[in-house]
Amino acid sequence: MKISCCWLFAISKFGYPPSLPNTYRALEEMAALGFKGVELEGVGEDNLRAVSGARQEIKARCDELGLTVVNFCPVLPDLVHPEKARRIHALDLFKLGVETASFFGSEMVQTISSTPPLTFVGDTPYKDALAFGQRYQVEVDPAFRWDALWGWLTDSMGACADEADRTGLKLCLEPRVGEIVSNTDALLRLMEAVDSDNFGAVLDTGHLHAQKEILPLSVEKLGSRILYVHASDNDGQTNQHLAPGKGNVDWDGVFLALKKHAFSGYVAVDVGNVPNLDAQYKKSKAFLESLAARLDV
């Protein structure tokens, strides 16, 4: 099992998104915890341009620390904006994200389906911070049309998959609570609509367990389309991202199913918004290493 460290580590420590100085600090701390593979993100236009602009320095620091960037995620909600000009601009930014991922030597570039363009009353998912266990209430505009939103999403994901393929990268997407694609079946429907062999899945155990999915069945549904795993635990009631073993995720079932489908990608520790973060990442890494040895995965 190849184990890496999610960018949620940096976000939990330094805010959303971390500044460039804190990006370097996060990488140093990831290396100190024993990780060799890491994620990076570019959140919105300003942060994406900042990370891309500093890519030579970031890559050099990763090399010094013995780190490999296994996944880069440009977070661009405007890929599904109702205004076409905003979607086109977001796609141009995604191209910058692909160039950045390629420069880092990543094999994957990740995207999100984003929150739907509804009016949230109170908390909005992933707006200013990555918070878990929230309750969402929305107002639906009478002019809202689901078919139009789905069309924007499929068109944008198709364009993103093509752009990634041109650079030799795989495109992956994770279903997340509160977003347009929030479960395995929605992702399968999106994959069918996009119809690209280059488009794969991030199996995020924390989000899917909170959606009451039977996780080994989720693995069976996605099969060889799983490119990457985000590993966190919870009690199935909320989408908390606790250390593996701290909730009731069926870890044996998940990894035996992954083994059946010959999964060989990275499993990333995706723990956040918990006390004693460093200790929880160490325990998570040890838990996954022990699981891998016991199940021979």
Please provide the spans of the model-predicted regions:
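A structural motif
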Residues: 35, 101-106, 226, 231, ...
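A short, acidic, amphipathic alpha-helical segment used as a generic capping/interface helix at domain edges
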Residues: 249-259
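N-terminal pre-domain/capping segments
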Residues: 1-108, 118-119, 150, 154, ...
